[in-house]
């Protein structure tokens, strides 16, 4: 059983961030009916469903129905967002059985706008969501990248939530169900780059990804579907995982010898080998 299944409900985004992989795939969004079909096939195979690989989930017009479908299948729904559309979707999120919301605050700096207005909107909505029982995580995953505004962002968070933060490794607890996570900027795996010291990864161990056309991929970083394992609309998940390619990936990591060229070029997977 997986811990996480990343289901891309849309590959369309309202921003253009320099840290994002982007895609040449055809712009597409799943219908609520298509998504329901997917989660029915994931039922019993994962604990959490993340509505993201690429794209901005809050642009989806059927977001409420999608989140409800996850809960109806006995799984927990998680969303990663750039935060710009939180105000417009506040009631939908409050009404939904949403387990966790992660907001990429580092998306703001590369897109511009009124920082205080953005942060106030994000913090107001997250405060209400946390009071409603949803875990809210603010992300600053830009260490070593575009981080000139981090000081202003941290200052705003302290002013809004107070400064009595509890530190734990690279994260801080700002209040009940409210967290701040710092991390280094990472590079998406690129088949054109050189190989890295990759020996192990959690792909196909604790997670799997489903792109918005139904293509199953080993993890949330295969944004172009470079390692297609099958299609969830055409095959059961068991059949996909029983494919020769999927088994080679799993056993390759077990033997510390990744079978896929893209995996051997993944900076994130390299962290498991350091």
Regions found by a protein language model. Name each.
Residues 128-136, 159-196, 221-271:
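C-terminal accessory region of radical SAM enzymes
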Residues 210-211:
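Short, acidic, Ser/Thr-enriched surface-loop or helix-capping motifs
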Residues 13, 17-20, 201, 219-220, ...:
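Short cysteine clusters
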Residues 108, 125-156:
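Conserved strand-turn element in the central/C-terminal portion of the radical SAM core barrel
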Residues 204-206:
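Short loop/turn microsegments at loop-to-beta-strand junctions
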Residues 1-101, 111-116, 120:
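Conserved alpha-helical substructure of the radical SAM core
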Residues 43-44, 90-110, 152-176:
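Structural recognition of alpha->loop->beta junctions
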């Amino acid at each position: 059983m997986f811990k996480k299944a990343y289901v891309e409900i849309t590959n369309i985004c309202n921003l253009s961030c320099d840290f994002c992989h982007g895609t040449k795939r055809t712009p597409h969004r799943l219908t609520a009916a298509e998504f329901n079909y997917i989660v029915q096939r994931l039922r019993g195979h994962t604990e959490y469903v993340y509505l993201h690989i690429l794209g901005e989930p809050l642009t989806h017009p059927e977001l409420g129905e999608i989140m409800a479908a996850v809960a109806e299948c006995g799984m927990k729904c998680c969303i990663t967002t750039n935060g710009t559309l939180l105000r417009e979707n506040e009631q939908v999120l409050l009404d939904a059985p949403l387990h966790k919301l992660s907001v990429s605050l580092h998306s703001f700096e590369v897109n511009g706008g009124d920082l205080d207005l953005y942060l106030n909107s994000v913090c107001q909505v997250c405060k209400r969501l946390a009071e409603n029982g949803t875990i809210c995580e603010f992300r600053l995953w830009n260490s070593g990248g575009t981080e000139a505004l981090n000081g202003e962002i941290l200052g705003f968070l302290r002013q809004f939530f107070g400064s009595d933060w509890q530190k734990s490794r690279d994260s801080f607890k700002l209040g009940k169900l409210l967290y701040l996570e710092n991390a280094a900027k990472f590079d998406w795996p690129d088949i054109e780059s050189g190989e890295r010291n990759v020996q192990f990864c959690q792909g196909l161990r604790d997670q799997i990804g489903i792109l918005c056309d139904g293509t199953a991929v080993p993890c949330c970083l295969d944004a172009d579907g470079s390692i297609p394992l099958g299609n969830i609309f055409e095959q059961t998940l068991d059949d996909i995982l029983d494919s020769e390619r999927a088994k080679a990936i799993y056993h390759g990591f077990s033997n510390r010898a990744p079978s896929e060229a893209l995996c051997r070029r993944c900076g994130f997977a390299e962290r498991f080998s350091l």
